[in-house]
């Protein structure tokens, strides 16, 4: 469950290390974002010579949350951290690699590129 001011890790090799959610997209007063939702983020920490720099604003898709996601069979998939993948204006990932596991729910959300790059899909 991600809301404004939430800090997230970055699960790709775009050069960002941590980002802060500045807006949850998809509704005028939408408060929370879960796995597969698009948020607006500001880069808070970045590595030198990366594709992005500190202070930049991007869209990102949430790929892991501590809150997790409930499956139709009643099981819940939870993670140890909150993580997002940065997107460009065409909703494609900026990085060329994805780190850590992602959930099968991203497949329904038109993020097949992220699912195919991920080392593990839960």
UniProtKB/Swiss-Prot annotation:
GO terms for cellular component: cytosolic large ribosomal subunit. GO terms for molecular function: large ribosomal subunit rRNA binding; structural constituent of ribosome. It holds the Pfam family Ribosomal_L14. The keyword Mitochondrion does not apply. Keywords: Ribonucleoprotein, Ribosomal protein, RNA-binding, rRNA-binding. One of its GO terms (biological process) is translation. PROSITE patterns: RIBOSOMAL_L14. Part of the 50S ribosomal subunit. Forms a cluster with proteins L3 and L19. In the 70S ribosome, L14 and L19 interact and together make contacts with the 16S rRNA in bridges B5 and B8. Binds to 23S rRNA. Forms part of two intersubunit bridges in the 70S ribosome. PANTHER family: 50S/60S RIBOSOMAL PROTEIN L14/L23, LARGE RIBOSOMAL SUBUNIT PROTEIN UL14M. Belongs to the universal ribosomal protein uL14 family. This is Large ribosomal subunit protein uL14.
